């Protein structure tokens, strides 16, 4: 199996409903996402994937939905609607708390399979860094 990894940076805010410490409040992170894609063999050009394709598909989705935006739990729509009305931005809502773990699972299991449909490769893992020192891997 041959693996290729592409890094994508983005800035986003979130809060964790029910958290007992400061993460219960709106705050932001400079996230770094590492997408690892694998295939059993290379294509006729000798590649698993053109890194530009990852950028064009994954980064485009990240930029449109997460970058410089708020990622909130769907139960946080009251505060989200107030922010949307005030700023005009479209908040991204998730079914679960927008922890690094849940964001990575959401991207790997729900978003990226749709973006990379009908390809000869698959996403094997995602690493999502919430800080320089803390990341999750799915």
From Swiss-Prot:
Lineage, highest ranks first: Bacteria, Pseudomonadati, Pseudomonadota, Alphaproteobacteria, Rickettsiales
Source superkingdom: Bacteria
Documented EC number(s): 4.1.2.50
Misc. remarks from the entry: The active site is at the interface between 2 subunits. The proton acceptor Cys is on one subunit, and the charge relay system is on the other subunit.
Originating gene: queD
Catalyzed reactions per annotation: 7,8-dihydroneopterin 3'-triphosphate + H2O = 6-carboxy-5,6,7,8-tetrahydropterin + triphosphate + acetaldehyde + 2 H(+)
Cofactor binding remark: Binds 1 zinc ion per subunit.
Binding sites annotated in the UniProt record for Zn(2+): 14, 27, 29
Gene source species: Rickettsia typhi (strain ATCC VR-144 / Wilmington)
Name of the protein described by the UniProt record: 6-carboxy-5,6,7,8-tetrahydropterin synthase
């Amino acid at each position: 199996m041959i693996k290729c990894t592409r890094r994508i940076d983005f800035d986003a805010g979130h809060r964790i409903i029910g958290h007992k410490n400061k993460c219960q409040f709106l705050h932001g992170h400079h996230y770094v996402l590492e997408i690892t894609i694998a295939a059993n063999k290379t294509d006729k050009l000798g590649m698993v994937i053109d890194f530009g394709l990852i950028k064009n598909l994954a980064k485009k989705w990240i930029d449109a939905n997460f970058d410089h935006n708020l990622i909130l739990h769907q139960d946080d729509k009251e505060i989200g609607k107030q922010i949307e009305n005030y700023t005009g931005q479209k908040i991204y809502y998730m079914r679960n708390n927008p922890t690094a773990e849940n964001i990575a699972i959401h991207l790997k299991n729900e978003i990226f399979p749709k973006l990379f449909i009908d390809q000869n490769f698959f996403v094997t893992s995602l690493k999502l860094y919430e800080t320089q020192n803390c990341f999750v891997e799915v």
